[in-house]
Amino acid sequence: MTSSKDVYRQALIRVLQAAYSGELAAGFAYAGHWRSVADPAERERIRTIEAEEWLHRQQVGDILIRLEAGPSRAREFAFSVIGRTLGPLCAISGWLAPMYGAGFLESRNIVEYEVAAELATMSGHVEIVECLLEMAEVEWEHERYFRERVQSHRLARFLPIWKTPPPKSEIRRNRRGLAA
């Protein structure tokens, strides 16, 4: 008979496998994105975001090992192709599309790490909650940066902007006791 903790552990592994492969795509895409922008400050900020995505991938990989799991080979292949395709496309798609796409995806990453933190608690792996919440907070900063960049564009008023995430402080406030 499977315990509820085992069910939550398997769900946690699936979320982390998705995050791990998503960070692969993000790393490759941001490598092309920062090279495509002309503004030095934007270039440097996106380079920093790229480095943070690679760090998240390493951290998620370490967590998967701790959970005696590994990445999904199918996801790894698919997301590698996606990231390696999107990166070079940034150079020809203009400034707005990569900023918009990045912001939208970062908004989803926040939730992904919040869900992972909840599943970690429910599966009895409270030792990884802090790391997951920290990654959610970093993703929140990424989303804010790209939202601000998109909103600075003259066409922004014509675009349906993705839902604004709750304030960054809510990431921890909503999860009080998860790491306890």
Predicted regions and their residues:
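Non-heme di-metal
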Residues: 1-180
